[in-house]
Amino acid sequence: MQKITVLCVGKLKEAFYEQAVKEYEKRLSRYCKLELLELPEQRLGDEPSEAEIRQALKKEAALVEQKLPKGGALIAMCIEGQEMSSVALSEKMQQFAARGASQLTFLIGSSFGLDEDLKKKADLRLSMSPMTFPHHLARVMLLEQVSRAYQIEAGTKYHK
């Protein structure tokens, strides 16, 4: 069974997001071993400078590096990443598995995104949309798409 790690910078605060995450954890349990890791987001003032943002992203990246699972494939969620359909994501996940990646790690950055050096280490940069979403919602959307990807692979009727 493949292991999926979703590593997020920032914690869920609203109960409705937590409920949605729990629902997708339940759905995914038949397809993979899911691990959700949350790391603290660096606190910045209301109008941080570019230098302050870069410094915060570097600090967050250092924490991420400590928690990244060894081996497997790293998928960085970022707006400039590749957009793909649900079917294409399912195929990409299958390709990673066929190449021996028994573990996939999806990385969701803080509200300021991800450090550039961290993105360069990713095997895939993935974008959900050119639109901007709250990171808490992005987590739910990612879990839904991972669930859908497994169901596409299994040939269930969920995906239409």
Language-model regions, residue ranges each:
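N-terminal beta1-alpha1 ligand-phosphate binding loop
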Residues: M1-L28
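Loop/turn-to-beta-strand initiation segments
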Residues: K3, A101-L107
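Short, well-ordered alpha-helix to beta-strand connector turns
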Residues: C32, G71-G72, A122
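General small-molecule cofactor/ligand-binding pocket signal
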Residues: L7, E35-L37
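A generic structural motif
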Residues: S29-E35
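Short glycine-rich anion-binding loops that position phosphate/pyrophosphate groups of nucleotides
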Residues: L12, I79-Q82, S110-G113
